[in-house]
Amino acid sequence: MQVDLATILSGYAQGYFLMADEETGSLAWYGTGRHAVIPLDERFHCPRSLRPLVRSGRFQVRLNCAFEQVVEGCAARPQTWISPELKQIYAALHRSGFAHSFETWQGETLAGGILGIALGAAFIGESMFYRIPNGSKVALVKLVEHLRERGFRLFDAQLMNPHLARFGAFLMDGQEYLKLLQQCLGIPCRFN
């Protein structure tokens, strides 16, 4: 399959994201009136019950060591929007330095991870998964720390859910989101 990276990146730069229909697998661009945003400032909240685990060192963090495994982990659900075609797009974005996996490990076992796309100072979280309980939660906390350290200004989680709300995620109005996204595109940040 030939992937047109310029078109894919342009879509994300305009606030859209790709999803495959769970039944047919056909890809389409989606946009929401409001985006779920995970704050990278003092509004981010690490649940009190999770703090000892984050500090314990039980999970180690790695970047881009198991990208394909993270994509497969994110797709391994009874109903998934990550089709084989979308997996190929993520792989092409990864080879080009745009798509990344942020992973938690226990020894040599992949515990969980987050799949996302970095564009300037924006990180667009596509999906997350865990194999060991709390693996994805610790990954989320550590990813926020990582993004802060590297000067990222936006962590777009796309769609709100109760899990993200526990960490302080909030819905940002579409126009405000697009304004912030455009600012972020002009700020060079390195994910690695």
Curated annotation (Swiss-Prot):
Subcellular localization(s) per the UniProt record: Cytoplasm
Any one annotated GO CC term: cytoplasm
SUPFAM superfamilies (UniProt xref): Acyl-CoA N-acyltransferases (Nat)
EC primary class: transferase
Highest taxon above the source species: Bacteria
Keyword check for Transferase: yes
GO biological process: protein catabolic process
Keyword Signal: no
GO MF terms, alphabetically ordered: leucyl-tRNA--protein transferase activity
One Pfam family in the UniProt entry: Leu_Phe_trans
Its job: Functions in the N-end rule pathway of protein degradation where it conjugates Leu, Phe and, less efficiently, Met from aminoacyl-tRNAs to the N-termini of proteins containing an N-terminal arginine or lysine.
Family, as annotated: Belongs to the L/F-transferase family.
Name this polypeptide is given: Leucyl/phenylalanyl-tRNA--protein transferase
Taxonomic source organism: Synechococcus sp. (strain JA-2-3B'a(2-13))
Name of the encoding gene: aat
